[in-house]
Amino acid sequence: MCSFCNQNKITGQAYQPTPLDVEQTLDKAASDLGERTKNAEIAFFGGSFTAIDRIYMLSLLDATKKFRDKFCGIRISTRPDYIDKEILDILKSYGVTSIELGAQSMSDDVLFANDRGHSAESVFKSSELIKSYGFSLGLQMMTGLYKSDIQKDLYTAETFVKINPDTVRIYPTVIMKDTKLAELYLNGEYTPYS
């Protein structure tokens, strides 16, 4: 698990949603939004969607079937090292339109120090593959990661521009309890940007 990750703390949920949960959420959203759903996407965030158990992932995507004509697309977030042609074929067949990659940094030393489990090269390769399939590409960046600095953050931003994604999300690093990053902070080994 990465140094800053704790999905239970981030989402406040200790359980995984079921396909029925997805259907009920989408049914309520469709009812609440009415015609505005035509401008809304179904989204699977809060982790690495393509890294979860394949049968579970497919069951969640199956739960979206009867709602696809009501929403303008499906957006997922995942890790760069969990993208390949097989997974993109599956996502395309289920109507996924946008894929956001949790790249976080384009400096390998920062990725390694934060236990990301992927390299900058995997961001380049998966981004190219995603774009070749016609998906909208989003890249996620975190500023102020452990072992990063302003220059490395600027390098990441400049590299993102070269990749030319459709969207970019920039997050500040937040220290969550019960993470390696919290331990580093408490031990005085990590100082967040002020």
Sequence positions of predicted segments:
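N-terminal glycine-rich anion-binding loops that anchor highly charged ligand groups
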Residues: 1, 36-37
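Local cysteine-cluster metal-coordination motifs and their immediate loop/turn environment
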Residues: 1-9
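Conserved non-cysteine loop/helix-boundary elements of the Radical SAM core domain that shape
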Residues: 10-24, 42, 46-194
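A short, N-terminal amphipathic alpha-helix
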Residues: 24-35
